[in-house]
A protein has these predicted regions:
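Bacterial N-terminal signal peptides
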Residues: 9-20
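Signal peptide processing junction and immediate N-terminal pro/mature segment
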Residues: 22-24
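Small-residue-enriched, tightly packed secondary-structure blocks
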Residues: 26-186
Length: 186
């Protein structure tokens, strides 16, 4: 007669192995999405390569989903990269109110241009734009160019979708949370 404890143990081991495999696949998927978002950013924004070179850290959210009907919210998973390597996973959330209807997604990239700004961001458990620090959202200038030499802000942000850079948008009120495990493995 088979031992029920052995069956349960084997089942738990099998589930654990499946979940570990799925977590690895999910992490790989997010890492691939982050890499694709950075490549897309460097194609769509002419000054991106110079800004990437100057940044001490880059927070990349490949897809932030926004939905609303008067009251709205957004959520997305991403990664903090330093010198092109992922050092921590993050989640962003936001709430908004006003005229809004529907669901959309967008890519958000936040660049830390000073070590002090990056250290302050990383030191807390949560960080809110507009309260813990300001993010200067960059829009195209005259002739669709960005003057990288005159950017003095310690934290700059870009919001774009598959059509390109989005205008008149803000990251104010967005909250950023460290995710100890890979977001999809939770």
């Amino acid at each position: 007669m088979p031992n029920p404890v052995n069956r349960v143990s084997l089942l738990l081991i099998a589930i654990n192995l499946l979940l570990a495999g799925n977590a690895h696949a999910a992490r790989t998927s997010l890492d691939e999405s982050v890499a694709a978002a950075m490549a897309n950013f460097q194609v769509k924004i002419p000054a991106a390569p110079q800004l990437v070179e100057k940044a001490v850290g880059i927070l990349v959210f490949p897809k932030v989903y926004k939905a609303g009907f008067v009251l709205g919210g957004g959520i997305g998973d991403g990664a903090l990269q330093i010198r092109g390597e992922t050092v921590q996973y993050y989640r962003t959330t936001s709430l908004s109110y006003g005229f809004q209807l529907g669901v959309q997604w967008r890519t958000e990239i936040v660049m830390f241009m000073s070590q002090e700004a990056l250290d302050k961001f990383r030191s807390g458990n949560g960080w809110q734009a507009g309260i813990d620090g300001s993010i200067a959202v960059i829009a195209f200038g005259v002739g669709n160019s960005i003057d990288t030499d005159n950017i003095q802000e310690p934290i700059i942000g870009f919001i774009f979708d598959d059509k390109g850079l989005m205008f008149d948008l803000s990251l104010k009120g967005s909250k950023y949370w460290k995710v100890e495990e890979h977001p999809a493995s939770n």
